[in-house]
């Protein structure tokens, strides 16, 4: 990846969902990758159903696509750093074999992300001791990532102990900038705090991976009122692709350009593919990028 180069990707989560494997189960890897080509994206992230590296690399090469990274659920606080480091090393070995750029990490200890709990009010909170252990652990995982030619990018996420802008501030302050970077996600920032620019402006120097996720304000407000879980919220359509929600990605993209951001911008929107046709929504995102963003470069 060259200096100041931005690569556009789209996540597999619109086709199949790792949190709910039954969603979109009929969408094959070949179907997903071919849709990505039709929508003119340059790559994707690894989904839970993706095959071993040799098979995946062949399918990617046939379509001239690349892998940006892959989600890793860390349990540093629950299982200890030793166990987390062992599983993360295997994760990085896989990513190295598919020529990825980043390892996406989210601490899932106490997470309500996959539980039937109110995602708006029942998120976990770490103690001071847990924060210290988490930051030390992430520094170590970041070193492992670097040894495999990868950057560890931390994903702030609804329903977890690192969700809010304040929690992201604490994570960034407590970790080594050389080894722990930030994955900035517009949708998670907006739904958590009602603002997506503050985190971007404050931590632009640490951001090495970006998710463009849009939100439907009316659905978000209804889900908040009903106390919905994370899964139920996305099944009801709280998330969508850029150009179909309420986030202004022009100001986000302008700030990234201003600070010479280099790396992936990945379109990501958890939706039920039986309701929101994945290719149709990939094309909505592609058209929005072409018509509203690329003229800013």
UniProtKB/Swiss-Prot annotation:
Induction: By inositol. GO terms for molecular function: manganese ion binding; myo-inosose-2 dehydratase activity. It is an enzyme of class 4 (lyase). Its EC number is 4.2.1.44. It catalyses: scyllo-inosose = 3D-3,5/4-trihydroxycyclohexane-1,2-dione + H2O. InterPro entries: IolE, IolE/MocC, IolE/XylAMocC-like, Xyl_isomerase-like_sf, Xyl_isomerase-like_TIM-brl. Pfam families: AP_endonuc_2. The keyword Cell inner membrane does not apply. Gene3D superfamilies: Divalent-metal-dependent TIM barrel enzymes. Its cofactor is glutathione; Co(2+); Mn(2+). Transmembrane segments: none annotated. Pathway: Polyol metabolism; myo-inositol degradation into acetyl-CoA; acetyl-CoA from myo-inositol: step 2/7. Optimum pH is 7.5-8. One of its GO terms (biological process) is inositol catabolic process. Keywords: Cobalt, Lyase, Manganese. Belongs to the IolE/MocC family. This is Inosose dehydratase.
